[in-house]
Regions:
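A structural motif shared across PLP-dependent enzymes of the aminotransferase-like
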Residues: 69-83
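Glycine-rich phosphate-binding loop and adjacent beta-alpha segment
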Residues: 192-261, 294-300
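A short acidic, Gly/Pro-enriched loop at the edge of an enzyme's catalytic core
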Residues: 177-185
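Mid-domain Rossmann-like dinucleotide-binding core that forms the NAD(H)/NADP(H) cofactor-binding site
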Residues: 99-170
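Short glycine-centered segments of the SAM/dcSAM-binding site in methyltransferase folds
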Residues: 64, 123, 206-207
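C-terminal capping/lid region of NAD(P)-dependent oxidoreductase domains
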Residues: 253, 260-267, 275-300
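Glycine-rich beta-strand-centered segment in the early N-terminal region that forms part
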Residues: 1-10, 24-72, 189
Length: 300
């Protein structure tokens, strides 16, 4: 275990789900059927190593790190984290930016690169392009040389264009699954379209990957996807992250340092205003990530 003095953490959809208890499945699987199992929320964090366990090999006190807390508790001044859930934070990226990466950027990277097998020149659509996962997905897809279409609401179109989307679709005005355009790869980072709608929007040998959105869409991808995929060349499914690979954190940092991926941060809140941060996130208006700060950057 590594004791981290937390400088910044970020809010994710799972925090809102745990807080509100709106997902019975989540309550059932996390052991918090009647009340949250963990009193302190937060999975993503960035900070400095305060102390290490005797078997820790990769880090030393004073190292700047970022990663996942493993079992919530990141909205705090200190957090013990498994060694394999952390990576070194280079000086080129701020603590706030680093804290915005793990839960959002990892599924975007794995969904596009590994499950989606993205290739240069492909037509890629990101549904939910303005959220935490979506903003990373747009930029990562562009870094692979894809032609990217981002789907979001009216007020967020300009932001999605600004991070590299070649085309944008306002879902309040147009349903992309009912149009003539077909896509080689669709990454669902939001929305509630059915797996059959997504299938319709794919090219003849296209791929659909669910990484975020409604629980119904997740189970459709997980349970129906493999069977639908057996009936033709189209491949459909949900991304299930079973273990962390520190190398993926390194890949994301390299993209950042190359100027190809920049965390989109909507708002910063001090730890004392974490309730307001969660309330704002819950309204669904955030563009990119909402970040909680424990130590001001100028004092870090």
């Amino acid at each position: 275990q590594v004791l981290v003095k937390v400088h910044a953490a970020s809010v994710n959809y799972i925090d809102w789900q745990v807080l509100t208890g709106e997902s019975f499945f989540l309550r059932l699987t996390t052991g918090g059927l009647r009340k949250p199992k963990h009193k302190i929320l937060g999975d993503d964090l960035a900070g400095r190593v305060e102390a290490i366990g005797k078997n820790v090999k990769q880090f030393q006190p004073g190292d700047s790190v970022f990663g996942l807390s493993a079992s919530a508790g990141a909205f705090a001044e200190y957090r013990c984290v498994p060694e394999n859930h952390l990576a070194h934070k280079p000086a080129s990226i701020s603590f706030e930016e680093a804290a915005a990466i793990p839960t959002a950027a990892l599924p975007a990277l794995l969904g596009l690169r590994d499950r989606g097998q993205i290739q240069p020149g492909q037509k890629v659509l990101i549904n939910g392009a303005s959220g935490g996962v979506g903003t990373f997905a747009v930029q990562i897809a562009k870094s692979f040389g894809a032609e990217v279409t981002g789907v979001c609401s009216t007020s967020k179109l300009d932001m999605v264009r600004s991070i590299g989307a070649d085309h944008v679709i306002d879902y309040t005005q147009k349903d992309f699954t009912q149009q003539d355009e077909r896509y080689d790869l669709i990454l669902a980072a939001g929305g509630s379209s059915s797996i059959f709608d997504y299938k319709r929007a794919l090219s003849p040998d296209g791929t659909y990957v669910f990484v975020g959105g409604s629980l119904a869409s997740f189970f459709q991808g997980l349970l129906l996807g493999p069977f639908i995929s057996m009936t033709g060349k189209k491949k459909l499914g949900s991304l299930v992250m079973t273990k962390l690979d520190r190398g993926d954190f390194v890949s994301l940092i390299k993209l950042y340092e190359a100027g190809k991926v920049v965390p989109v941060i909507d708002r910063l809140y001090p730890l004392s205003e974490v309730a307001q941060a969660l309330r704002y996130f819950g309204k669904g208006h955030a563009q990119g990530k909402v970040v909680i700060t424990m130590v001001p950057e100028d004092k870090a």
